[in-house]
Amino acid sequence: ADRTEVLAALPEAGVQLVVDPGCDVESSRAAVALAEAFPHVYAAVGIHPESLIEEEEPTVAVYHGDWAAELRDMAPLFGDERVVAVGECGLDHHWPVPRDAQLAMLEGHLRLAAELDKPVILHDREAHAEMYELIRKYKPKGVLHCYSGSAEDAKWIAAQGIYLGFGGTCTYKNARKTVEALQKLPLPTAADADLDNAFVCLGYASE
């Protein structure tokens, strides 16, 4: 379906608010433009860790820039009243992404979120220990989307004031740990409706 038609139909379907996260400068600007076009859509602005990938991959863009400079270039976007969060940002050790650069970039986002008093949209793939350490250090509020950790860790994260997102990976046959975490969390501590619901569980659009 056409994205514009889908977004326009959301209020009638009972969806009150949507937050569209950016993953780089271009998509962050697009998210702000989309938020300005629909009263029930808001934007988040940030740089996804996969943007730092050094080699061509079929599912990610290749980053050849300076993330700190790009984050500074995004500064005017955070002044827009339609921008309600920082992100998507985080750590991803599944792809060949430089770890030092990822950590530095995530800390830059977390410091910015604290300065702006905005929540963050966090990405954590195969980087639980480092992510949890930064949560302890910066104490952000927001959501950790597409959660894949243990039930014990999920309870701790929720106790820090961070919502947990559970995406399409919950349907995987080997996702017992994730399903257990979901079952042991009180709602509305758990919620996720980002692109990963479709992206990581490819099927038909109607599904």
Walk through the language-model features, giving the residues of each.
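Mid-domain alpha/beta scaffold segments of enzyme catalytic cores
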Residues: 1-207
